Swiss-Prot record:
It is found in: Mitochondrion inner membrane. The gene is MT-ND6. GO terms for cellular component: mitochondrial inner membrane. Keywords: Electron transport, Membrane, Mitochondrion, Mitochondrion inner membrane, NAD, Respiratory chain, Translocase, Transmembrane, Transmembrane helix, Transport, Ubiquinone. This is NADH-ubiquinone oxidoreductase chain 6.
Length: 174
């Protein structure tokens, strides 16, 4: 189970390296959709069945619409792939070498530690017994998103609105 999560995380980062190397919008959209699907698999592997399904449906559904529109607007006769230009190829290779180096370093020195600790987990308990508590990940994760991360939800919604407005203005030609 740990190796599956580790492999999914490596594939996720390699997908982001492939996207950040700025290939043609066709290939960039494809890699971002694949990375989103792998990210949903990471969420499913960590026990968030409901959250993984919602992210898959909402995120990837929206991404397919946006990248379908982007691909139609930015169609190229000869799209730039990862091996077609020296700059793109070098950036992908540098990213992959850094990722492989990080994987080997983590495997050799066992340098993975927990970065985030929750201080008030007691308020998230669904059932508390004698010295133990039951936490269900799915409803607690959605509840924590809308309770403790309410400003993050507002900022995310505003960012999506501004992004749609910018795309509409660019498509209009102003």
């Amino acid at each position: 189970m740990t190796y599956a999560l580790f492999l999914l995380s490596v594939i996720l980062v390699m997908g982001f390296v492939g996207f950040s190397s700025k290939p043609s919008p066709i290939y960039g959209g494809l890699v971002l959709i694949i990375s989103g699907a792998v990210g949903c698999a990471v969420i499913l592997n960590c026990g968030g069945g409901y959250m993984g399904l919602m992210v898959f449906l909402i995120y990837l559904g929206g991404m397919m619409v946006v990248f379908g529109y982007t691909t139609a607007m930015a169609i190229e006769e000869y799209p730039e792939a990862w091996g077609s230009g020296v700059e793109v190829l070098v950036s992908v290779l540098v990213g992959l070498v850094m990722e492989v180096g990080l994987v080997l370093w983590v495997k050799e020195y066992d340098g993975v530690v927990v970065v985030v600790n929750f201080n008030s987990v007691g308020s998230w308990m669904i059932y508390e017994g004698e010295g133990s508590g039951l936490i269900r990940e799915d409803p607690i994760g959605a509840g924590a998103l809308y309770d403790y991360g309410r400003w993050l939800v507002v900022v995310t919604g505003w960012t999506l609105f501004v992004g749609v407005y910018v795309v509409i203005e660019i498509a209009r030609g102003n």
